[in-house]
């Protein structure tokens, strides 16, 4: 998210939580509140998608956009990857809801509002799952009463 001088952004971090600010990674050693008073681009740790979680087209697009925020040295490369992926998605997706969201994402990124683009992409995850026929994972219960997917 980008903070500007007109409105300060207040953030609360838990002990051990990380935040990415202008490409730097900060970790709180205890519960802390921060106030960003000037222009800063940041991403909270719970919004950072890990490479192994890029299992759908929208998650892959999110990852490319995310890299523009948290790896400034790779911004140009990530931007090119993002643009290529977005172009492919316009050719692939036929759903009006997702296509409209992708148009907004394209505009947001073009205007330097990458954090807002990330929020827009995340909001489309349920629709993408619906279109892909994804079902929530439900582990069968064994005779012992434990979920088969649970750790022993």
Swiss-Prot record:
GO terms for MF: mRNA 5'-UTR binding
Superkingdom of origin organism: Bacteria
Transmembrane intervals: none
Keywords: Bacterial flagellum biogenesis, Repressor, RNA-binding
Family: Belongs to the FlbT family.
NCBIfam families reported for this sequence: PRK00794.1-1
Role, per record: Has a post-transcriptional repressor function in flagellum biogenesis. Associates with the 5'-UTR of fljK mRNA and promotes its degradation.
Protein name in UniProt: Probable flagellum biosynthesis repressor protein FlbT
Name of the gene this protein is made from: flbT
């Amino acid at each position: 998210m980008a903070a500007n001088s007109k409105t300060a952004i207040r953030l609360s971090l838990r002990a051990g939580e990380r935040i990415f600010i202008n490409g730097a990674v900060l970790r709180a050693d205890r519960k802390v509140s921060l106030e960003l008073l000037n222009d800063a681009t940041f991403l909270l740790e719970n919004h950072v998608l890990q490479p192994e979680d890029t299992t759908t087209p929208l998650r892959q697009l999110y990852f490319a956009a995310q890299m523009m925020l948290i790896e400034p040295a790779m911004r140009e490369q990530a931007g090119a990857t993002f643009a290529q992926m977005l172009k492919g998605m316009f050719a692939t997706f036929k759903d009006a809801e997702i296509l409209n969201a992708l148009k907004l994402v394209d505009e947001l990124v073009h205007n330097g509002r990458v954090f807002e683009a990330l929020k827009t992409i995340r909001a489309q995850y349920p629709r993408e799952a619906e279109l892909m026929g994804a079902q929530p994972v439900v582990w069968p219960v064994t005779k012992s009463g434990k979920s088969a997917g649970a750790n022993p």
